[in-house]
Amino acid sequence: MVTKRTLLAACLLTVLIVLGAGVVLLGGCARKETVAVPVAVEEKKEDPGLHQAAEEKIAGYTRPEALISVYELNRRLEDSGTFIIDTRGRSFKVLQASYPFGHIPGAVPVLHSNYCHPAYPGRIAAPLQLQDFLGKCGAGAESNIVLYGNDGLQARLYWALKMYGFDNVKILDGGLDKWKEAGYDVATASSRRPPDTFEFDLADSKAEQTMAVFNDVAAAVGDSGCVIVDARRNDEYLYKHMPGSVNLSSEELFNQDKTFKTAPELKVLAEAKKITPDKKVIVYSNAGVRSSLVWFALSELLGYPEVKNYDGSLQEWIKLERETEKSLQTKPVTLQ
């Protein structure tokens, strides 16, 4: 009897070891990351009606290729060309508090500083620096890049890529929150890709059409053919803003679920602020981040022909001792 028990225990131990090894091997095959899969959680079935409604909304924008719904991304998740970037890393501390606690499977995390100019803190990186960084992250010339975030950095990186001539890029409508709401899995382990070759075709650079510099803004002040848009919160605008600017806060662009409002809703919102497509538009914030969201809405979603994002934004304007206007005495908490 003792011998039989001993043999039975040995067999059970062998089975457990084999199963454990199998789990480890399987975990190492999924996009080079180990994903924590919830146990005994019922899979949420996709609602075809929600998917269709999301696609119809996106189709209503001037450039529908600029956005992707969570439903469509889920279908493309295993495509080898899909390259997802998590832009929530405003700082290393923020990245540590967000990415390891849940991200879209396969998403590569980036820090804001990774695509900032080393000599001009907060300014966008030069094209050679940015392409080298993206290549090291694993993005290639044929990658289908999808960006998601929650504070405007997704739009800033989108703006930079488009400015330097790379068009195969989209923003995830609703970001990670919408992804979770749809019931899709999230990963917790870091995702890495082998380095690739990523190069901008600078012959297609749109820098002159998409980025405003100080002289552009100075010339626009007082010009009836131009409108300067402040993308910050209203309390920030009231405390201090560029002369003659109008306030269209980036927060006004979104629904409660953090998806963009429809094209007709955005159009009404912009025109109520006297922001019309017949004018040259320059958008600013504190450091060119939130202004990227308003640039994206006006340029990509509504198709305004002349919209520029002021990279230096209010930080540069004040540093150069240019005039500002104010009507609120209490200084608010400011963002980028």
Residues of each region from the PLM?
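N-terminal secretory signal peptides that target proteins for export/translocation
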Residues: M1-K4
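Bacterial N-terminal signal peptides
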Residues: C11-V24
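Thiolate-centered catalytic microenvironments shared by cysteine-dependent enzyme domains
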Residues: E33, V37-G60, P64, I124-A212, ...
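Positively charged, proline/Ser/Thr-rich regional signature most characteristic
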Residues: E55-E142, D216-D278
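Terminal peptide-recognition signature
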Residues: L73, A107, L161, W179, ...
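Solvent-exposed loop/turn segments at secondary-structure junctions
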Residues: G89-F92, S113-H117, N150-Q154, L176-K178, ...
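C-terminal soluble interaction/assembly domains
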Residues: V268, D278, I282-L301, V307-L314, ...
